[in-house]
Swiss-Prot record:
Its main location: other. It is found in: Endosome. GO terms for cellular component: endosome. This is Biogenesis of lysosome-related organelles complex 1 subunit BLI1. Keywords: Coiled coil, Endosome, Transport. Belongs to the BLI1 family. Residues 51-102 form a coiled coil. InterPro entries: BLI1 (IPR020491). It comes from the Eukaryota. Component of the biogenesis of lysosome-related organelles complex-1 (BLOC-1) involved in endosomal cargo sorting. Component of the biogenesis of lysosome-related organelles complex-1 (BLOC-1). Pfam families: BLI1 (PF17324).
Length: 103
């Protein structure tokens, strides 16, 4: 009798485990299909660049950064030049005033 009760418990436990495994497998399958569909949609929307094109874009980026740095250097040079010209203009104004007063 105990053996039968134990067997019933084992059978009930096995049924429960089988049911849970079935539900888990079903849920996993549904999520896998949904993820696969999502990946397909993403793949359609966003085309990946090939290695050559990515390399070319990288080189273009470096070239653009170098050009930008050159422009920044020129701007800095012209700003310094402007400051020097403003100082020279002030000196000339002072000299002009001194010359005008001495006449």
């Amino acid at each position: 009798m105990i053996k039968q009760d134990v067997q019933k418990c084992v059978d009930a436990l096995q049924d429960f485990v089988d049911k849970e495994i079935g539900e888990s497998v079903n849920l996993f399958s549904c999520k896998s299909r949904a993820n696969n569909e999502l990946l397909l949609n993403i793949d359609e929307k966003f085309q990946l660049k090939d290695k050559d094109e990515l390399h070319q874009l990288g080189e273009q980026k470096i070239e653009n950064q170098n050009k930008l740095q050159e422009i920044r250097n020129k701007v800095e040079y012209y700003e310094k030049l402007l400051t020097e010209l403003e100082e020279a203009q002030k000196e000339l104004e002072v000299r002009y005033k001194l010359v005008s007063k001495s006449k």
